[in-house]
Regions:
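Short, Lys/Arg-rich N-terminal segment immediately upstream of the first membrane anchor
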Residues: 1-5
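Functionally engaged cysteine thiol sites
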Residues: 6-9, 105-108, 173-175
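The feature captures two recurrent sequence modes
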Residues: 7, 26-30, 203
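Hydrophobic membrane-insertion alpha-helices, especially the h-region
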Residues: 9-22
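Membrane-interface motif at the C-terminal end of an N-terminal transmembrane signal
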Residues: 19-33
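Immediate post-signal-peptide N-terminus of mature secreted/exported proteins
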Residues: 30-114
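Compact alpha-helical subdomains of small soluble proteins
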Residues: 58-65, 73-77, 116-207
Length: 207
């Protein structure tokens, strides 16, 4: 089970949503326009594919997301804003796995509740910290989710197709793999392991 969980995790690249919601946060603060979110998402995809041409699209986007998020957190001088950026990145990671992915798999007639429940337990403390950081700038995860829900659905379609192709299974079987190994996958993908910079900023305020 451990090996399978790692194999799934290597392709899932849940971090693709980090910058989607980080960009969503910026767009909401600056322009409050859906068009800006879509343009940012398109750039993330283009840059990811350009810089990682031999990787599946979702994994290329994930690597680009991690790099950009780390750079932007390091460049932010104001701690409150830095925490809010980290929180928005965190909730991209969190919501794509607790809302968008379960919805996708339900459409495949697969219930991944075991994974979702384990994921929520693993991130209870971080979710509380992220909510506090967003509250400090007068927003919350539901506002962020509403802004980028369309983009998260696009990320999931690409992501799940990549999982299926990598493991030589159908998309429905990919959902079943996640459900069957929910505890293992959730434990392996704690925010501190997947995106240390976001975790560090959430918990200490430092980039």
């Amino acid at each position: 089970m451990q090996g399978l969980g790692k194999k799934v995790l290597s392709v899932l690249v849940f971090v693709a949503a980090f910058v989607v919601v980080k960009y969503g946060f910026d767009a909401y603060q600056r322009y409050k326009t859906q068009a800006n979110v879509e343009a940012s998402m398109a750039k993330l995809k283009a840059d990811g594919v350009k810089n990682n041409p031999n990787l599946p699209v979702s994994e290329a986007m994930g690597r680009e997301a991690v790099a950009k998020t780390s750079e932007q957190l390091s460049a932010e001088g104001d701690e409150k804003t830095r925490r809010a950026r980290a929180a928005s990145s965190y909730f991209g990671f969190y919501l794509v796995n607790t809302r968008t992915r379960p919805e996708f798999c339900r459409q495949q007639n697969v219930d991944i509740t075991p994974f979702v429940s384990a994921f929520e337990r693993e991130h209870k403390a971080e979710s509380a910290q992220a909510r506090a950081a967003l509250a400090a700038v007068d927003t919350d995860e539901n506002q962020l989710f509403g802004l980028v829900e369309k983009q998260l659905k696009q990320v999931i379609v690409q992501d799940m197709n990549d999982i299926a192709a990598s493991n030589k299974v159908s998309v429905r079987e990919a959902c079943q793999m996640i459900a069957s190994n929910g505890e293992t996958v959730a434990a392996e993908m704690h925010i501190s392991k997947v995106q240390p910079a976001v975790y560090r900023t959430l918990t200490t305020g430092r980039p």
